[in-house]
């Protein structure tokens, strides 16, 4: 009996706090969104970016593929033809796939990238009806990432 009374006391305390507005309530998702409340350190899904010339920044070094803990990234490197104006870069990704179901959004791929070609975006609604839709290919990753101008300072200079 004492356990039941203690449980009811806790329930009444929570109910009282709810009526007085002292507790947080679940956010009603479609109407309310976290977009304005996301912290600066939020890590979303990865995306590829292009440089100012429209070239894919990724040089297919495969560091992100090797460092990815769940092995969510798959890259097939290819040679750039010598007739191309960007032939000085020796490789480019023929295929670049990220399995968003396996990705744990740790940010290690972003940190290890020497070309600043992969960034974690700030969206949290990543959906799909099938497993195949959750594997983002190079074209989709580039569409999401867009163009990145200049060099981005990834480190906090205030510390």
Residue ranges and their predicted role:
Residues 106:
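Conserved strand-turn element in the central/C-terminal portion of the radical SAM core barrel
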Residues 1-102, 111, 115-159:
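Non-ligating segments of multi-cofactor redox enzymes
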């Amino acid at each position: 009996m004492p356990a039941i009374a203690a449980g009811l006391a806790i329930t009444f305390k929570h109910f009282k706090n709810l009526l007085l507005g002292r507790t947080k309530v679940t956010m009603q998702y479609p109407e309310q969104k976290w977009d304005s409340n996301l912290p600066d350190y939020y890590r979303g899904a990865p995306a590829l970016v292009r440089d100012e010339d429209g070239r894919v920044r990724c040089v297919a070094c495969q560091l992100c593929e090797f460092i990815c803990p769940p092995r969510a990234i798959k890259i097939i490197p290819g040679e750039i033809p010598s007739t191309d104006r960007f032939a000085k870069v020796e490789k480019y990704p023929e295929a670049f796939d990220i399995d968003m179901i396996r990705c744990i959004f740790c940010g290690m791929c972003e940190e290890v990238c020497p070309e600043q070609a992969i960034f974690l975006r700030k969206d949290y609604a990543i959906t799909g009806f099938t497993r195949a839709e959750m594997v983002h290919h190079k074209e989709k990753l580039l569409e999401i990432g867009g163009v990145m101008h200049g060099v981005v300072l990834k480190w906090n200079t205030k510390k």
